[in-house]
């Protein structure tokens, strides 16, 4: 199942890079909120890590489960992005850009998960 040219693999990796860069910026800006920043870093990079792991899944069920974990992490990331925007940790431009990419991953993951047919 491994395919590095797969669009969701590429998009989730690019998103993880953006999250890491955002994290580095936030830590330089204000170290007092490090525990919150770590939450964003963990969930935002976990999306791509689980998608990558799904590429070596042992079965369709395993593949789907890894993608479900990625979807949960994407929803968590959406939460942290919204919280950071509402509390003025992220500016509107950065928030909108990251949120757009996060929502695209949510749509892609949802579509892929729905399309996976398992034997009853």
Which residues does each predicted region cover?
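Short, C-terminally biased terminal segments at protein or domain edges
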Residues: 1-53, 57-120
């Amino acid at each position: 199942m491994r395919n590095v040219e797969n669009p969701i693999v590429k998009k989730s990796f690019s998103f993880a890079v953006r999250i890491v860069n955002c994290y580095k910026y936030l830590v330089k800006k204000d170290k007092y909120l490090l525990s919150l920043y770590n939450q964003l870093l963990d969930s935002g990079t976990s999306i791509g890590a689980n998608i990558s792991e799904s590429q070596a899944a042992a079965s369709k069920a395993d593949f789907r489960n890894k993608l479900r974990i990625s979807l949960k992490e994407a929803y968590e990331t959406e939460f942290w992005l919204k919280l950071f925007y509402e509390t003025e940790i992220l500016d509107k431009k950065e928030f909108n850009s990251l949120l757009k990419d996060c929502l695209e991953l949510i749509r892609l993951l949802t579509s892929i998960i729905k399309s996976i047919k398992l034997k009853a």
